[in-house]
Amino acid sequence: MVSVEEIRQAQRAEGPATVMAIGTATPPNCVDQSTYPDYYFRITNSEHMTELKEKFKRMCDKSMIKKRYMYLNEEILKENPSVCAYMAPSLDARQDMVVMEVPKLGKEAATKAIKEWGQPKSKITHLIFCTTSGVDMPGADYQLTKLLGLRPSVKRYMMYQQGCFAGGTVLRLAKDLAENNKGARVLVVCSEITAVTFRGPTDTHLDSLVGQALFGDGAAAVIVGSDPLPVEKPLFQLVWTAQTILPDSEGAIDGHLREVGLTFHLLKDVPGLISKNIEKALVEAFQPLGISDYNSIFWIAHPGGPAILDQVEAKLGLKPEKMEATRHVLSEYGNMSSACVLFILDQMRKKSIENGLGTTGEGLDWGVLFGFGPGLTVETVVLRSVTV
């Protein structure tokens, strides 16, 4: 008879969790940021609000975003006028969209990740699904299991309403699952669709308007597992993780699910709160490794907006190229909430290989991934690149 201790030992993986594949997807509808203010004020019947439109134009100009992808197009919005109003009861219409579309977009990203991984989907043991777009039972994790044809015994974990830090959360959870379940292969999917937060403009809540200038739709998927087989090709090791709530940050970023959809609230000092506390998080993460030069590591930071990135750079004295992959994703896709950091991870390994930089992390060994979001919550993931 085996002992509990022997069972426990047999469950543990030998080595650290690794990211083995990454896939991303966006809806087909692409919006150009330079023409978006005209479109947005026209489609929401708000063209009479000329001063507010000028403000919104300035927000879009300063956003450092070139384009975004959105499930909501003109046709869908014309069929759902309640979604275009600032505060009209519209939750049912929004739910009908996202309950269908969030798993579908997730499937597109997951299919790409599974293809790159190169193993049969029957080898997936765990599924983590994360979205801030809609809530339903059974959840998007169940819908995706059906859409992909995963085994009914796959162990599912559904994360709703986490917000922009959750790209870090899913990696932290996937690491714990992979390292504590020998042979586990975890499919992680973040799928975000702004149909829950889209609404017309108002001059009483400019933070709502900031969201309309920044948010985009996208889904990203990764396969995480320890002890890779010879046929599996790890991209990054997940070395260490942490989550913390920043001091004096209550109410800095809030979202509330109401009859009018998901409302978004933002305090102006979010970039200040993050930049003030970022060094503490880095010291905790990198002191054990003997690293104190933060220009010597590669960077993946959730691009909440350009002001956050600017202030973090200034506070730490980072060279402009450190945030290159992060700024590229912000520019090409906008803020896709939880999916962003996984898009950046994908961008980084692709550019590193294209440019012949020697490792998946821009030629460097060590890196950091940060998620920032409601709370204010900060997720920190220490990554180790692999040689290419």
Curated annotation (Swiss-Prot):
Keywords on record: Acyltransferase, Flavonoid biosynthesis, Transferase
Top EC class, one word: transferase
Database matches in Gene3D superfamilies: 3.40.47.10
Enzyme active site: C164
Entry's family note: Belongs to the thiolase-like superfamily. Chalcone/stilbene synthases family.
Protein name: Chalcone synthase 5
Function description: The primary product of this enzyme is 4,2',4',6'-tetrahydroxychalcone (also termed naringenin-chalcone or chalcone) which can under specific conditions spontaneously isomerize into naringenin.
This protein's record includes keyword Transferase: yes
Organism field: Glycine max (Soybean)
EC number(s) on file: 2.3.1.74
SUPFAM superfamilies: Thiolase-like
Matches recorded under PROSITE patterns: CHALCONE_SYNTH
Reaction(s) the record says it catalyses: (E)-4-coumaroyl-CoA + 3 malonyl-CoA + 3 H(+) = 2',4,4',6'-tetrahydroxychalcone + 3 CO2 + 4 CoA
